């Protein structure tokens, strides 16, 4: 049960992170300023440590993540809606840096965030891009391959 509670708190943290990363993308405010604003407004029952780690991690690596993601997109990154760009950055960061979070959890959470905050059908785009991104993360290859082979066994 504890893991379930922790998972829900992380899900809520991701929801706040998308909002914070959107603000970062649109305003260019620093991670410190955004963190202060979110803490002052009250974050509710979320994993605050996870929120803090990821707001700084994603913003510190934004240019690198953007470069990696750009190679997988069908259009320039700047043409993506800031919400989708924020979700992609968050998902890419988790896939590459938070290896204890299962691959499928990162993808599923990102898809749900796109359904909640993104444009109609953006969840499909997010799913495809992050799945391709996961293939570029060497340490995710075994986990991703295992999932794909199990899917193939069912067909």
From Swiss-Prot:
It holds the Pfam family NusB. SUPFAM superfamilies: NusB-like. InterPro entries: NusB-like_sf (IPR035926), NusB_fam (IPR011605), NusB_RsmB_TIM44 (IPR006027). Signal peptide: none annotated. GO terms for biological process: DNA-templated transcription termination; transcription antitermination. One of its GO terms (cellular component) is cytosol. GO terms for molecular function: RNA binding. Keywords: RNA-binding, Transcription, Transcription antitermination, Transcription regulation. Gene3D superfamilies: NusB-like. Belongs to the NusB family. Involved in transcription antitermination. Required for transcription of ribosomal RNA (rRNA) genes. Binds specifically to the boxA antiterminator sequence of the ribosomal RNA (rrn) operons. PANTHER family: ANTITERMINATION NUSB DOMAIN-CONTAINING PROTEIN, N UTILIZATION SUBSTANCE PROTEIN B-RELATED. This is Transcription antitermination protein NusB. The lineage of its organism: Bacteria, Pseudomonadati, Pseudomonadota, Gammaproteobacteria, Chromatiales.
């Amino acid at each position: 049960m504890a893991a379930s509670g922790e998972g829900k708190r992380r899900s809520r943290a991701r929801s706040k992170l998308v909002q914070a990363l959107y603000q970062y993308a649109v305003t260019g405010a620093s991670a410190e300023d955004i963190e202060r604003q979110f803490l002052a407004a009250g974050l509710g029952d979320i994993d605050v440590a996870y929120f803090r780690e990821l707001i700084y991690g994603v913003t510190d690596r934004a240019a690198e993540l953007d470069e990696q993601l750009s190679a997988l997109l069908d259009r320039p990154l700047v043409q993506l809606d800031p919400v989708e760009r924020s979700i992609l950055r968050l998902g890419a960061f988790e896939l590459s840096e938070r290896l204890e979070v299962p691959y499928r959890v990162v993808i599923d959470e990102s898809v749900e965030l796109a359904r909640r905050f993104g444009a109609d059908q953006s969840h499909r785009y997010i799913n495809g891009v992050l799945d391709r991104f996961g293939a570029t993360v060497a340490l995710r290859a075994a986990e991703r391959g295992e999932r794909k082979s199990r899917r193939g066994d069912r067909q």
